[in-house]
UniProtKB/Swiss-Prot annotation:
The lineage of its organism: Eukaryota, Fungi, Dikarya, Ascomycota, Saccharomycotina. The active site is at residue 451. SUPFAM superfamilies: Acyl-CoA N-acyltransferases (Nat). One of its GO terms (cellular component) is cytosol. Pfam families: NMT, NMT_C. This is Glycylpeptide N-tetradecanoyltransferase. Gene3D superfamilies: 3.40.630.30. Keywords: Acyltransferase, Cytoplasm, Transferase. Its EC number is 2.3.1.97. It catalyses: N-terminal glycyl-[protein] + tetradecanoyl-CoA = N-tetradecanoylglycyl-[protein] + CoA + H(+). Its main location: cytoplasm. Belongs to the NMT family. Monomer.
């Protein structure tokens, strides 16, 4: 890419979607052979052409005593640092590092608008450990120049009924000026060492770049809420033979929701939501198993009501008998818009977990699809009061059932799911494996949502 190209701002929501996953998806000819991945060749992950004939760990069985107590060596000018997110100044350091370096394009017209509340939600769920927030500092100045995080997560593969204590790896970020120092592979090895010391040997992670070897691939889709604003900042274009007024009319949403009994989730709803989600997740091949305190954290942000959180929004549907029949949730992570005379922020919502008891009524699948479409239409409506401009979801879960009806458009960004030190059979991500097009009206096998 030329320097001139680098300065061009993204011109479509699809470009935005690519950056959300820290890299662009690659076409088949661009996928390198295993021998070219010097680092991943040394790691317990399947190669691209490996035939999966059994399910289970790849590496030989170890114990924490087999793992060194000392961190991996770094280049002499750097030192390891355990980042204490309980301290505001260190939280600010992580914010600054990610804000300035998490998006590749130095001249990008937007930045992730993280907040302390978002980091506390994303990085401090029940069971979190300070030592799993690893940083690298410059010895001479103490400046934080790299960061990687792991949080505890319990995975379940429903076909085999195997439950896997794991971690989710996220927020791997190296300062742009130090990308040639090969810090990222060392950081992955170091976070692996720290996690292994707690007798955890598997991890789940995602990325837009194709590495050896995805267990599932999902496609980004997006639904404009404020089309006019997206057009103003250059993320939406005016299609041929369309007018601005026509586009506004196409994406217009009502001001009120339609589902009877819909309301914000409260902590008192936790038991019913837990049972509903637990049963609903039996539909998918790979899911996260939640304890109730974990679910309270992820759906309520550790608050007593949904309205207390500025990050996660959760809604339930209560019937006339006081039973909860449905719920949905989404989280908010806006972008700061730079160098735009009219707008300084882009509101973005990301679909999170949901469930409906209509899914359990096998005699009428069409009713379930209609119910999902109605629920997600209401999710779009509720997002307007949080100044959301575009609502994103993947082709995971049962999202293909409503994506078209709710006017989500397929982006050209993809998100690949990877299991570290575990092999399992490929899982459908709601898209055709060859064409990568969305498979409408067909469930995916991916029931776990990563930030």
């Amino acid at each position: 890419m030329s320097e001139e190209d680098k300065k061009d701002p993204p011109k479509s929501i699809e470009d935005l979607m690519k950056l959300l996953s820290m890299g662009e998806s690659l076409t088949e000819p661009q996928q390198k052979q295993m021998k070219d991945y010097k680092f991943w060749k040394t790691q317990p992950v399947p190669s691209f052409d490996e035939k999966i004939d059994s399910e289970g760990p790849i590496d030989q069985t170890k114990t924490p005593d087999d793992i060194p107590d000392t961190p991996l060596p770094l280049l002499n000018e750097f030192e390891w640092s355990t980042v204490d997110l309980e301290k505001t100044d260190q939280l600010d350091e992580v914010y600054k590092l990610l804000y300035e370096n998490y998006v590749e394009d130095q001249d990008a017209t937007f930045r992730f608008k993280y907040s302390h509340e978002f980091f506390n939600w994303a990085l401090k769920p029940p069971g979190w450990r300070t030592e799993w927030h690893a940083g690298v500092r410059v010895k001479e100045t103490g400046k934080l120049v790299a960061f990687i995080a792991a949080i505890p997560i319990t995975l379940k593969l429903n076909k085999s009924q195997k439950v896997i204590p794991s971690v989710e790896i996220n927020f791997l970020c190296v300062h742009k000026k130090l990308r040639s120092k090969r810090l990222a592979p060392v950081m992955i090895k170091e976070i692996t060492r720290r996690v292994n010391k707690y007798d955890i040997w598997q991890a789940l992670y995602t990325g837009g770049v194709v590495l050896p070897s995805p267990v599932a691939t999902c496609r980004y889709t997006h639904r404009p809420i404020n089309w006019s604003k997206l057009y103003d900042v250059g993320f939406s274009h005016l299609p041929a033979n369309q007018t601005k007024s026509g586009m506004l009319a196409n994406y217009a949403l009502p001001n009120t929701t339609k589902t009877q009994g819909l309301r914000s989730m409260k902590i008192e709803d936790l038991d019913q939501v837990y049972d509903l989600l637990h049963k609903f997740q039996e539909k998918f091949d790979i899911v996260q198993v939640f304890e109730k305190d974990e679910l309270a954290h992820w759906l309520l942000g550790g608050k007593s009501t949904d309205t207390s959180s500025n990050v996660i929004k959760s809604y339930v549907v209560e019937n006339s008998e006081g039973s909860l029949t449905d719920f949905f949730s989404y989280y908010l992570l806006p972008f700061t818009v730079l160098d735009n005379p009219s707008h300084d922020e882009l509101g973005i919502a990301y679909l999170y977990y949901y469930a409906s008891d209509t899914a359990f009524k096998n005699d009428d699948e069409s009713a379930y699809k209609q119910r999902l479409s109605s629920l997600m239409s209401d999710a779009l409506v509720t997002s307007k009061k949080y100044n959301v401009d575009v609502f994103n979801c993947l082709s995971s879960q049962d999202n293909p059932y409503f994506i078209k009806n709710c006017k989500f458009g397929s982006g050209d960004g993809f998100l690949n799911y990877y299991l570290f030190n575990y092999k399992t059979w490929p899982i459908t991500g709601g898209i055709d494996p060859q064409t990568k097009e969305l498979v409408e009206d067909k469930s995916s096998g991916v029931g776990v949502i990563l930030l």
